[in-house]
Amino acid sequence: MIKSELVQRIAEHNPHLYQRDVENIVNAILDEIVDALARGDRVELRGFGAFSVKHRPARAGRNPRTGAHVPVDQKSVPFFKTGKEMRERLNRETGDTDTGA
């Protein structure tokens, strides 16, 4: 599912809202999550999961084409950990008994 499909589904379930208003709300939520992560904050949506930032240290990499060693700078990457309710629901729907915890 892409963002436009999400907006459309939410608008269909909420006929009292205009689709452009739903799109503005979805964009505002995503912007707030990104802003919080950029500040170094953790964003927890109870039952859904938590977004955080992991910091990867600089390391030596390798160019796969030439085999030459190249330095890879440190970087921050987004990380998402699923919430318990989401894991349980996904496992119930797929029949998987391993909760991944």
Curated annotation (Swiss-Prot):
InterPro entries: Hist_DNA-bd, Histone-like_DNA-bd_CS, IHF-like_DNA-bd_dom_sf, IHF_beta
Keyword Membrane in record: no
Gene3D superfamilies in the cross-refs: IHF-like DNA-binding proteins (4.10.520.10)
Entry keywords, A to Z: DNA recombination, DNA-binding, Transcription, Transcription regulation, Translation regulation
Renumbered residue ranges of the record's region Disordered: 57-77
One Pfam entry name: Bac_DNA_binding
Recorded GO MF terms: DNA binding; structural constituent of chromatin
Biological processes, Gene Ontology terms: DNA recombination; regulation of DNA-templated transcription; regulation of translation
Stored HAMAP family: IHF_beta (MF_00381)
Protein name per Swiss-Prot or TrEMBL: Integration host factor subunit beta
Organism: Rhodopseudomonas palustris (strain HaA2)
